[in-house]
Amino acid sequence: IEKGVRINTARIWDMSLISIGKGTVIGGRAVILGHLAEKGEMVFAPVKIGKKCLIGTSAQINPGCTIGDGAVIASRAVLKKYTHVPAGEIWGGIPAKKIKESD
């Protein structure tokens, strides 16, 4: 976790698999997972969140996701495992998809 990161009441599991860039804000009740159980097997994969991102309240970031610098993940959005969010994009929904590019 780099300097200037603000984390509200997030749940971050598997800290050794999670990187969060400078100036990112993680909203309350957001969940960031480096692992999950799938079909009786454990899946482990790193999560990389870039600089100056915003992860909304109650969003869920699953294993293997990468979020580019300045991207926004809307409140309650769920990123499926191994999702790549390019820099500067806004994603939302369940499952999350691109809504628009940030201004």
Task: Give the role of each language-model region.
Residues W13-D14, P46:
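Short low-complexity stretches enriched in small and charged residues
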Residues I18-S19, K81:
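Intrinsically disordered, low-complexity boundary segments flanking structured domains
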Residues M15-S16, M42:
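Right-handed parallel beta-helix/beta-solenoid
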